[in-house]
């Protein structure tokens, strides 16, 4: 669906539509294939939702899931986790959920952290999520992404559309290396 083997993906999500649930489903699939997942989240996962989505996994599979909350300090967590992330393989997955705050511009420290994580991850499958926001400019594009400052990532949108509960819309390919 997201073709994570083709490089890092930035998923811009309309609030409340299920971006974290989508990433948890991808996490379950990766863990079922006996690979590892490192999950970095700005806030704690909803335990009921996580339990429901990961319910089919056994203890051995769940032992390969590393979940860390970074709050407002992604850069410090990213720096501390660099040795672990350097050991991930192309079958593993790195999820950075809500990598930047949901209002305003992405802080310089968060951008620095994400660029470092992308570089450290190498060929590891990587997905970044952030909240999409409605464009105030009236330039014809209703939605904007907080990840527009990131190069080397594919931009994907998860938005509500008339007649559909949710829709994935592929927008762009990376134009430059990370």
Name each region found by the language model.
Residues 88-155:
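P-loop NTPase motor core
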Residues 20, 129, 175-176:
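Ser/Thr-centric signal marking residues that sit
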Residues 79-88:
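Conserved alpha-helical scaffold flanking the Walker A/P-loop in AAA+ ATPase domains
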Residues 153-154, 161-168:
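Conserved AAA+ ATPase core "coupling" helix
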